[in-house]
Amino acid sequence: DPVLAGELVRKTEAGEEALPHLYIFGGGHVGKAMAAACALMPVHAVVVETRADELEGMAPGVATRLTPMPEEVVRAAPAGSAFAVLTHDHALDFLIVAEALKRDDAAYVGMIGSKTKKATFRSWFIKTAGGTEAEFSRLVSPIGGEAVKDKRPAVIAALAAAEIMTVLALHAAPARQ
């Protein structure tokens, strides 16, 4: 029945619009693993990359965005979005994370890396990028926590996906009440 089919399409599209947005910056090994994990989750996942070849082979159902200026994607993202930053370049990570932290409506801002990378980012963010301690305090780094020391991309991705889904569920909970 064409009428029922049309109604089903409208309901499906409305449901997808209501999903929280997760932007995965970086399409390397961890980015691909994160995209695969998030393809099964109730999120609108988008992998953002500056290198076209890294967008090949992404999980079905995950959107991709090729752009020379990933921080513009951060600016255009809807309120309540989550940002997971794991590019191939620390300087690029810093620019993207700084842009995300300037938004007070981001549900999650996470960056892959070590304690040293986080400390270096903090110094740059406060001294050079004009960030505040309050903004910096919202950064989750390393993504996925520190309890599990396994550095395999699939493990990092699974831990980070669980962390992000928890934050998104808590962020959405007040809206459901």
Predicted feature descriptions by range:
Residues 21, 81-83, 108:
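Structural motif
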Residues 51-52, 115:
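Residues in the short beta-alpha loop(s) of Rossmann-like NAD(P)-binding domains
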